[in-house]
Amino acid sequence: MPDNEVHALFIGWAEARISDRRANAVFRRMAARSGIDRRWSVLAPPPHGTQVVGGFYDGAMPSTAARMAVYAEEAPRLALRAIGQLGPLGRISHIVVASCTGFVAPGIDQIIARALGLPGDVERTLVGFMGCYAAVAALRVAHHIVRSGPDARVLVVMVELTTLHLQGDTEIEPLLGMLQFGDGAGAAIVSAERAGLAMDRFFAATLPDSHDLIRWTIADEGFVMALSGEVPGRIADALADSATRATIVGPGPVDAWAVHAGGRSVLDAVERGLELPATALADSRAVLATCGNMSSATLMFVLARMMAGKRVDNGVAVAFGPGLAAEGFGFRSAA
């Protein structure tokens, strides 16, 4: 994660923008119930920040080009920090990078490879603009690479700078949407070695008539998130459907759930739709509390907590994003 904690600062910034007293009270109440205690940003608060107050833009909103300039500098830096936590990388044959919060060319995959001193014949894949379930797509690509060539060692990286896309809204709904998001990066090595978590049974399920419920649009002043209030209810209904549930749950009893921490209401919907006990999503709720929603990087944080915990015999990882779709995979402790 970055060094700048911004959750409380954002709440103060947002409250100052809501002129209606009743709406302001609703915002404060919803913020208190969000399940989020801390979020982090690459944007530094004063006195180190320049165009920002409390870690966020002040006054005129910067152009998309200005935000992409920050992304080009900060995203590789945060990704390399996450990679550094893996320890010695050893031989790397492939690199797969997922990010939906910025664009730069040469790509962030090339920037990371060059910074790590990887040889020029390392094969690269960039998963872009998929949203919160991009971690699943990146891990799926790595999984198939290793299945095709068991000697492969794939470096997988997710890096998201969601706070770059703060908008100048004064209405409560978009401000509550922005309340959830923070910056973060996660990394892993996918190989045929018997260590960590073993992945299998990748799946996808797109909900019918839901394509407008989550939108991520490139605008003149950053990327704009539109998140319908219908999303949690539609997720709960879909998970209660026997066919969708069978796709996600798979053949056996599940002893661990790694659910993308997309917000308290989303986690509540998953818990309700799958009829899970209150403790089943404890790791996801812990990540939400300490980091917020970091888009594709979030699931990596949940999986890291599970790797540090008890043995998993039949786990399911799942994330939700534009479509509206669920993507995920089965996993178990490898050793």
For every predicted segment, state its role.
Residues 120-121, 127, 134-141, 158-184:
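Active-site glycine-rich loop that binds ribose-phosphate moieties when present
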Residues 66, 70, 81-84, 215-288:
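A contiguous, well-structured pocket-lining segment that forms one wall/lid of small-molecule binding clefts
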Residues 98, 128, 153-160, 182, ...:
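Short beta-strand segments
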Residues 100-101, 119-121, 126-147, 236, ...:
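Claisen-condensing/thiolase-fold acyl-transfer catalytic domains that form or cleave C-C bonds
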Residues 36-118, 129, 252-267:
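Conserved beta-ketoacyl condensing-enzyme motif
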Residues 1-70, 168-237, 241, 245, ...:
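Condensing-enzyme catalytic core mediating Claisen C-C bond formation in acyl metabolism
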